[in-house]
Every structure is written in C-alpha cells, then in structure tokens.
Amino acid sequence: MRPTGRSAQQVRPLTFTRHYTKHAEGSVLVEFGDTKVLCNATVEEGVPRFLKGQGQGWVTAEYGMLPRATHSRNAREAAKGKQGGRTLEIQRLIARSLRAAIDLKVLGEYTITLDCDVLQADGGTRTASITGACVALADALNQMVANGKLKKNPMKGMVAAVSVGIVKGEALCDLEYVEDSAAETDMNVVMTEDGRMVEVQGTAEGEPFSHEELLTLLALARGGIDTIVQAQKAALAD
C-alpha cells in the first residue's frame, strides 16, 4: 500500500493554477500532491550572443527552492554566493525539456526564461517544474500571438515529466518523498505529448535494474505522462 493509497500506476492529485502572479507573461502554480512549484515565464527581446543574427529564439530556465520547502531549513544559494551542482543540473534539464516543446525558428529573436521556485517539496520537484513550466510557456506564447509579437504560435505540443521507480520490488509512478528516499531504482522521464522521449535519467540506488525493469518503468512513465498532458490541456482550455 502506498502512503496515500494510490495504485502503482496512479499519479498524485494534480492541479494547475494559471495567472498566479500578475506581472509575468505566463504564471502557473503547479501542485503534485504536496509538492508545489511556482513557474513564471518572462519574455524578453534579444537572444544570447551565440545566437545573434541566426533568426531564432531561446528558452532557458532557473530553479530554486525556498528555505523551508523541505523538512529543515536550507540556506538560500544566493546567501552562499553560488548555485549548487544539483540546482545547475535541474535548471539545464528544465530548459532542455522546454526547448523540445517549441520551434525556436518560429519564436524569432526572443528569449523566454522560466523561473521555477519550489514552495514545498515532497518528491518530484524537477518533474513538477517541467510540467508546470510548460503550461506557463504556453500562456506566454499565446500572449505573444495575441499582442502581435508573433504571427504564428511556435508551440509544437506539450512536454511533461514524471518520476518512476522501484520501491520494495514494485514499480511505482510519481514517487513522493518517502517512496523516493526508499527506492532501489529512481528514474525521471520527460516526454512529448505524443510519447517521444526528451530525457531519461535513471539510477540504481541498490541492485542494478534489468532491461525488462527499464521497459516496465518507461511504460509506467508513459501512462503517467498521458494523464499529466490531459491535465495540462484541460488547464489551458479553462
């Protein structure tokens, strides 16, 4: 029995609160159970130096956790004077994932930054960030079309992510913290809405996992992501 009584295939209760803050071009509070992440999209004219003159845009991301997002307080990275390796890895993952959702040539010379701030962490913060940021990105792009900044929407489709893992020998979808901390195998999967893989991050914490277990976990992730994409689209249709 899982802590919240879910089935092995079931994702946590999922909500998207759009237009959560008023200044950002896209702003979404995403909640996967007790994990809550604020995702804001900012649109700016211009692109990084390495893209100037190429007629395409850029999507980047920043990620951070509030000091009391977890059980005990973690000092702000700004107070330490540098970002940690985990933070850098996660924000690069978020950016890579979101770039898979849009046609950068159609975007033109604009940069969109997704700021993902974890308000409360209970497992799956990076996958929640990707999932919520994609909705914020969609809102920002829709606004750019409505304002006449873009003639065509560069969004190719939704991108979503979920964690899967093996806990006490059982393959589970969308791990919460107590499951994640006890997992023998832990994997984060990012997919497009049509089931193509953007990124797969998998680690055996204990015993190595088999090829068959890998396929089981990927199938579990696909099912979870299908559910998540439906929720993304329903939120955007409101």
From Swiss-Prot:
SUPFAM superfamilies (UniProt xref): Ribonuclease PH domain 2-like (SSF55666), Ribosomal protein S5 domain 2-like (SSF54211)
Enzyme class: transferase
Domain of life: Bacteria
Keywords of this entry: Nucleotidyltransferase, RNA-binding, rRNA processing, Transferase, tRNA processing, tRNA-binding
Reactions this protein catalyses: tRNA(n+1) + phosphate = tRNA(n) + a ribonucleoside 5'-diphosphate
InterPro entries: ExoRNase_PH_dom1, ExoRNase_PH_dom2, ExoRNase_PH_dom2_sf, PNPase/RNase_PH_dom_sf, Ribosomal_Su5_D2-typ_SF, RNase_PH, RNase_PH_bac-type, RNase_PH_CS
Binding site for phosphate: 86, 124-126
Pfam families xrefs: RNase_PH, RNase_PH_C
Biological process, per Gene Ontology: rRNA catabolic process; rRNA processing; tRNA processing
Signal peptide residue numbers: none
EC number of the protein: 2.7.7.56
One GO MF term: 3'-5'-RNA exonuclease activity
Subunit (UniProt): Homohexameric ring arranged as a trimer of dimers.
Family designation: Belongs to the RNase PH family.
Biological role: Phosphorolytic 3'-5' exoribonuclease that plays an important role in tRNA 3'-end maturation. Removes nucleotide residues following the 3'-CCA terminus of tRNAs; can also add nucleotides to the ends of RNA molecules by using nucleoside diphosphates as substrates, but this may not be physiologically important. Probably plays a role in initiation of 16S rRNA degradation (leading to ribosome degradation) during starvation.
Name of this chain's protein: Ribonuclease PH
Organism the protein comes from: Pectobacterium atrosepticum (strain SCRI 1043 / ATCC BAA-672)
Gene: rph
